[in-house]
Amino acid sequence: MWNRRKLCLIAIIFTAVCFKGTAGEANLLDTRHAHVVDDLYNGCREKAMETYIHSGLLKQELNNSKGFQKAWSANAECSALIAGGIKEHTAALSVYYHADPVFLDTFDEAVETMGINASIYENDFHFKALHFLLMDSMALLKQKECKIAYRVTENKVKPAKGSTVRFGSFVSVNSNYDWLMHNEDIEGMVLYNITTCFFVNPGDHVCSKDKEELLLSPAEVFTVEEVAKRMNGDEEYIEVILKHSTLNSTHNCFSFSRSAAVVSPQWLVSVLAALLFFL
């Protein structure tokens, strides 16, 4: 009995403090995974713009990351503003074209894991401005029609048919199926066939000729329509068909709805109560 209690205690402590995810690809997650920073800033856009962009936080976050700085300034000569946006929106979109993989891994991991509570978000999520600008760009460029896009991944975890999922971070996908099948080594891989209704085509706004790459959001929820084996010539792969379901912002207006000073003690009390139960 004591061993069981000890294991439970270890599990609780691990859940409470070990929030680091797997860097690399944007993971496909069950929608019950609540650690993702999925803020859509509904109802607090102006406050977010002032807090994250005009107050100097963006500059501070840029100064704290050389990778962020490099990607941000790589396409400075491009001034194609999005409708209703500012030059910072364009710069944020260009990050996904010019950032090195190491920085994107760091950013993706932070988005996937730093939404545990307001305290961690406020103190440890160092890309608030970039996250806001990307989400706001998608809102400003709200699509009139949905679009089908694709992503090839090594991730062997296949979601169950009928389940609802989302990506753990922003994710780049390609809308050209023929190009993908001819240029990607798909043997043993997983192909996500994605119908998305909340996306942005960065190429339209960062002076790029690539009009087939789309950027998706961690706030978009998909229903798994089908999971099946497919063949492309002599290459076998798994196709996972995802259809847009809804948008879900678990942490909407995270910085403004409740302060970290309020949320953090509540979270700590709940963890301590659980610990005492097993002692």
Question: What annotation goes with each model-predicted range?
Answer:
Residues 250-268:
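C-terminal GPI-anchoring signal of eukaryotic secretory precursors
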